[in-house]
Structure formats: structure tokens, C-alpha cells
Regions:
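Short, flexible, solvent-exposed loop/turn segments with mixed acidic/basic and small polar residues
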Residues: 39-46, 111
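An acidic, glycine-/histidine-flanked metal-binding catalytic module
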Residues: 116-212
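Helix N-cap motif at beta-to-alpha junctions
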Residues: 56-60
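A common structural junction motif
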Residues: 69-76, 143
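Short Gly/Thr-rich strand-loop-strand
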Residues: 77-99, 103-112
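Short helix/loop capping segments that flank catalytic or ligand/cofactor-binding pockets
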Residues: 62-64, 104-106, 130-133
Length: 212
């Protein structure tokens, strides 16, 4: 994945993990996978392996999501949060992909085959939202720090999302403005870097372009 992202020129970081046995057991119990009569009775755990792609530019999120669908044998099954005008919510962009056969045989314990799927999860988010998600995951999803009696603080936690979204938009807008300034100054090399927001090599442009 990193090789493909690097070759395409994205600004990104990648984090990954494989669930530890105790973490895997906790989730199997919490989600009631395969337990008759529950909403997950026909489901398996799909994120034994988790990969997170952290992007520096917000408008790369959708591009990378579509890009990932092209580099594996099958497109991902995506779970995304739709934005609306009335509220700010954590934007979930998570994809489930099939593990290659040679990996699933070495990673997934056959004795857990009824409970753990031969898949992995990829999460895509921006650098601005990364820290918020980490705190929210530990305090709210894994614990109950924002439980009953802390509704006002939970709302305040969610309101931070609006600021982070503005920060993401501001960074993209600033680089676009910088590119426009370089265009007016006829600095084509810098203009192209700002316009596409990709990692180019340090080689100079073709002399024909430089002389325009």
C-alpha cells in the first residue's frame, strides 16, 4: 500500500496494527459475533488487521478511497459517514478488503475461522482528525468517560470537529492561494506543486515550460 501511495505522490502517513489476543477476545464478546439472536449472529470480526492512512490534504480522502479500490483484487466494502448541514460528526471512511490467500492462511487461526473473517480494514482520515479520533476511541468507544452526566462535555468534544474541518479546508485553500500567487509570478514549478499538492521530484521542469 505504501509503495503505491508513494509512487502516486500523496502526502500521507501509514499506521497499522494486528489485534492482540486479549483485544480480539474483548471485541468478540462486545460485538456478540455469531451469537444466535443478536444483530451480529451472521457476522465475523473483520479487522484483525487494521491499517490507517492519514492524509495531509482533505480533498485527497475521496481520491485515496477510490485509488485503494484499484490496487487489490477486489474493491473494498466501504462504510462512510454522510455529511449534512445540521450537525458535525466524526467522518468515518472505513473499507473492508479481502486478505490475499497466502496471508490469510498464515494470519487467521483456523480454529477461529467461524468468528474471524479473512479480511482487513483500512481507515482513511486527515491528519487533523487523527488525534481527535484516538482520544474519542479510548474515551467513548472503549470506555464511558463521556457517559451520563457528561453530556455537555461530550457535546463540546463533538464541537471540536467543526474547528478541525475548518482547519482542513483552510490548509487546502491556503495552498491554492499560494499556487495562484506563483502563477502570477510565473513561477511554474512552485505553481504546479501547489496546484496538484503532490510530491514531485526535485528535478527542474522542462526548459520549454520554464520559458513560458
Amino acid at each position: 500500500i505504501e509503495e503505491k501511495l508513494k509512487k502516486a505522490g500523496f502526502y500521507y502517513r501509514v499506521a497499522y496494527r494486528v489485534k492482540a489476543p486479549d483485544s480480539m477476545l474483548d471485541k468478540l464478546i462486545l460485538k456478540d459475533y455469531r451469537r444466535p439472536g443478536t444483530e451480529n449472529q451472521d457476522k465475523k470480526m473483520q479487522d484483525l488487521i487494521g491499517i490507517r492512512i492519514i492524509l495531509y490534504y482533505a480533498d485527497d480522502v475521496e481520491i485515496v478511497k477510490n485509488f485503494l479500490d484499484t490496487i487489490f483484487s477486489m474493491p473494498g466494502v466501504w462504510n462512510t459517514t454522510e455529511a449534512n448541514e445540521y450537525e458535525f460528526r466524526a467522518m468515518k471512511i472505513n473499507g473492508i478488503f479481502k486478505l490475499p490467500g497466502y496471508l490469510s492462511k498464515t494470519i487467521v487461526n483456523p480454529e477461529l475461522g467461524d468468528y474471524v473473517d479473512d479480511t482487513f480494514e483500512i481507515q482513511v482520515r486527515t491528519n487533523s482528525f487523527e488525534g481527535w479520533h484516538e482520544i474519542e476511541h479510548d474515551m467513548r468507544y472503549k470506555g464511558s468517560a463521556f457517559g451520563t452526566g457528561n453530556e455537555a462535555l461530550a457535546r463540546k468534544m463533538n464541537s471540536i470537529l467543526a474547528t478541525l474541518e475548518l482547519c482542513d479546508d483552510s490548509v487546502v485553500g491556503l495552498i491554492e492561494d499560494l499556487g495562484h500567487q506563483h502563477y502570477k509570478d510565473r513561477k511554474w514549478n512552485y505553481m504546479l506543486r501547489c496546484h496538484y499538492r503532490l510530491k514531485f521530484t526535485r528535478e527542474p521542469l522542462h526548459p520549454y515550460i520554464e520559458e513560458i
